[in-house]
Amino acid sequence: MKPLLPSRASDAGVPGLACLFVAAVLALPAHGQPVVDAVIPFADAHVHLNDPAMQRDLMQRWGATHAVVFWGGRSSNESVLDAARSQPELIPFASISPERTAYRPAWERDDPALLHQLDALLASGAFRGIGEIAAAHFPAAGFAETDFSPLGPMMTGIMELARKYRLPVMVHVESTRLQELAAMLLRFPDVPVIWAHGGYTPLFLARRMLQQHPNLYYELSARTWPRHPRSPDYTILRDGVEVWPEWLQLIEQMPGRFLVGTDASHRSPASEAMKFASVQDFLRQIRPPVREQVARGNLLRLVGLAP
């Protein structure tokens, strides 16, 4: 896929890598011996940007050279874009997710005015993707359940805009809407779709969906946490640390189809550090020949920052 937008001089992640060097020096023990585990540079596919300053600190500490950022409980499309303008390592996505109380009524009445609003945002050329769109999302802390069909008028309109502007779309769709998601992917084979958390699907469904839909990308945020607060089987870890060998095998068989993410939301420094540390722990378990694709290459290519 050709780059979607012109690249910038800072897109190569040089500032982020410089921060990694500084972090590595600061991490040296007092006696000057190097730490055992080096920080692995990665591009974070999933951040709810509520606190740009905290996000910057976390990225510098944990090796994130880039991050896809979008709405949070305390942010909007406008504030996300403002942050990205001052922090070029942030990759802004525009969203009209029904999980937001401001947008939900429009989804319930299939209001095209909301799609026109998204069209205007994308026409600015400032956003590198669409999402996160929580079309079907089980209840979570602070957010009511959403259950809109991926084949409905709103998602269809979003996908048509993604096609128009040649942008990827990040969707949160649970396994209860798997059939409609598959049909949507077939209807828009030219639109890259990032599946947030991979829909928390088990291994065999992940494999099937990836084999059947070449435009689908399986995003692993919250799947690498030591423990998921909603369900213990949501993670891909067998003991809170080690990735199941079968998952590693699938990822290494299809390295061009997986993305890493933190699902950061800046609730507290401690909770966010856990999320970033889990990405580092996961990446250390992937064989080096394919690690770079999963860690950074796939995402940067999708958003037009790499060939």
Predicted regions and their residues:
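A general structural detector for well-ordered alpha-helical segments in enzyme core domains, enriched
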Residues: 55-58, 79-83, 114-121, 154-158, ...
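Active-site gating/metal-coordination segments in enzymes
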Residues: 74-168, 225
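Mid-to-C-terminal alpha-helical segments outside catalytic/metal-binding sites
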Residues: 4, 8, 14, 28, ...
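Hydrophobic faces of well-ordered beta-strands that scaffold small-molecule active sites
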Residues: 43-47, 67-69, 92-95, 129-131, ...
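N-terminal carbohydrate-binding/catalytic regions of secreted carbohydrate-active enzymes
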Residues: 47-87
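Catalytic pocket-lining loop regions of alpha/beta-barrel enzymes
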Residues: 145-259
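Active-site beta-loop-alpha junctions enriched in small/polar residues
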Residues: 48, 72-73, 95-101, 133-136, ...
